């Protein structure tokens, strides 16, 4: 991915609309069907209950004693994420894949121009306990900033890495950050700590949904470029106040700081995880806050994670889209014609994956299953269907499982595979588990049989023949086709004609139930 870098001054005047990709503007664009607004003052302790299981994003106009503005569950519905990209929900994955091929353009602007640095707090004033951070789950280790996007520079490449992270507040100027799972940030932190160097990090809180999608992508490139590519527009960035990390200039809040060079760790958690259960207490690095910058009218953001209604959470929706992109790429080399991919959000966005393919050669359904299992550790159950099944429909998937699946023939189980340690069904401490593939396709070459056809109301598209006999001499036809061929809107007159034809020609039916005139039958019997 080649990144075009330009100096901001070369694009003046008024080169950037810092409102176009602003979180506040996106929230304001949502209609009543997608946004619930709470104008009345509300204690921070009550926020989580309002958002739990909510199908809408929720905007609180007066949260906590500071009466702060806060929005949550912005990405908790696929329709809202699709709206951020300007497409319909079923078009989302393909649109993201298309934009990832864009050549990114990044423009650095001055600190004076950057809206995210309109207010700058450093030293003792950089107090994270003054932010509207709430307790999300009853047994959490403390209030969490759950919607932060981390920006860190990889010292080996000079690239900026972008990811999604959670911050557990420890004090006015310290947070815990979960770095147990393998990630680019973990690798950068461990390398710096081994060399006795601190790791500067900046966290953006309050970002457009597109930037969150960039945060879940993991690619060996400068990931500021992914933000720019997905925005489908030049990205304005600014250097932070207490480090040289560049972040989007249109962010709502930025929290700057570092992990110390000694690799000091403290207990972090427990926390309600994205699979719907609690994660245990872990020893994680301490993040030391050096600055908080924000817009004049900054909008704070929180993300929904965990609980029984996983499918309505930010984390599940974001994870699902990342899973779909990864699986789609893996399928390109595994099968000739992948049609669609959907990762169910009720499984956390990654454990249950549905794939539709058009089989061109025998065995492609199993190839698809193998590709999915190998593409991601947390892809646990793979369901492959023919393209006539709508993979976004639970009803149709249930029907395919009931009518096209034989367990002794179509179930593939693979054991000893790398998996996600957070899976609560695994033995404690295990990183190896089993995966299952469900081939819900018709056996190759059998999908065109009559018994594989789905009954549907007849369709009549216009007369093509002058008589039923002429239509039959054209080739075997179903009764519906005979009606269409002669322009019948009733069908009973066709029955009468067929009755008369039986006395004239050798009229018969084939194994599929189609009417036909036997070859060399030209006259009366």
Model region roles, listed by residue range:
Residues 403, 470, 484, 500-503:
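Short basic/hydrophobic patches in alpha-helices and adjacent helix-turn junctions
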Residues 2-270, 274-286, 290-460, 481, ...:
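Extended, highly charged
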Residues 331, 372, 471-472, 498-501:
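Hydrophobic C-terminal alpha-helix "anchor/cap" residues
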Residues 465-473, 495:
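Hydrophobic residues on short alpha-helical segments
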Residues 35-36, 477, 507:
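Conserved hydrophobic residue
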Residues 470-481, 489:
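Short capping segments at the starts of secondary-structure elements
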Residues 488-500:
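Short amphipathic alpha-helical interaction segments
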Residues 499-525:
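Charged low-complexity interaction tracts in eukaryotic proteins
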